[in-house]
Amino acid sequence: SKHALGMAIDINPLMNPYVREDGYFPKNATEYLERDITLCKGEHKDKMIHKKDMAYKIFKRNGFLWGGDWEDCKDYQHFYMK
């Protein structure tokens, strides 16, 4: 896997869940499905990754792609290199 090769990383899965049309994971991430940080009710919403977030900027600047940009599903925790 890309994770085992050091070419992918998942950050704060609870605050940055994997979301598909038929559900999301982890199951206790319900309050973080709202991705607008001003509307999110999660206690740790400051740990959510979004395009203005420092983690997003650093990873993108270093050539990583983000699962939050995927079309079919969203993997907000996932950064990876092609």
Predicted regions and their residues:
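Active-site-adjacent substructure of cysteine-protease-like catalytic cores
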Residues: 1-6
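Catalytic cores and adjacent binding grooves of peptidoglycan-active enzymes
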Residues: 7-9, 13-82
